[in-house]
């Protein structure tokens, strides 16, 4: 990916994983050393428009997972991330918002993001995302607090 980003003929736009966990979860299975932040940094350096994906990291940054782990174990990293994200849920509660809304506000607040691609399953989730878009952006300090949780 970095080769394409740094090539003389660059992509018109890039989808980048943007979440406080800095995790691709189960979709990062092909490369254990995958680091979403390094991809995003290269995209920003090259001034490539960025579409944020995985804001709630397959449910890991929500109040509860909406499914059970698949028997094959292919999505285990998403469930591992859910457990890891407990401090994030604590901060969301302290700040008076749902974890999903806070995760979307985070993605919308990161400098260099052109748009956030949503993965919603119902109208309630969609409404929460629309509300997050209407809220003030997180401050740099709030962003750092969330990033430093992990």
Indicate where each model-derived feature is located.
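Beta/alpha (TIM)-barrel catalytic core signal, keyed to glycine-rich beta->alpha loops juxtaposed to Asp/Glu
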Residues: 1-150
């Amino acid at each position: 990916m970095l080769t394409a980003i740094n090539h003389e003929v660059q992509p018109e736009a890039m989808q980048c994983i943007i979440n406080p966990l800095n995790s691709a979860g189960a979709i990062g299975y092909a490369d254990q050393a995958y680091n979403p932040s390094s991809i995003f940094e290269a995209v920003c350096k090259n001034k490539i428009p960025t579409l944020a994906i995985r804001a709630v990291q397959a449910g890991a940054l929500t109040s509860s997972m909406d499914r059970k782990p698949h028997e094959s174990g292919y999505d285990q990293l998403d469930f591992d991330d859910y457990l890891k994200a407990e401090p994030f849920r604590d901060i969301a509660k302290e700040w008076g918002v749902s974890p999903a809304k806070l995760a979307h506000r985070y993605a919308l607040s990161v400098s260099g993001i052109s748009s956030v691609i949503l993965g919603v399953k119902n109208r309630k989730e969609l409404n929460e995302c629309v509300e997050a878009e209407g809220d003030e952006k997180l401050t740099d300090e709030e962003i750092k607090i969330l990033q430093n949780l992990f």
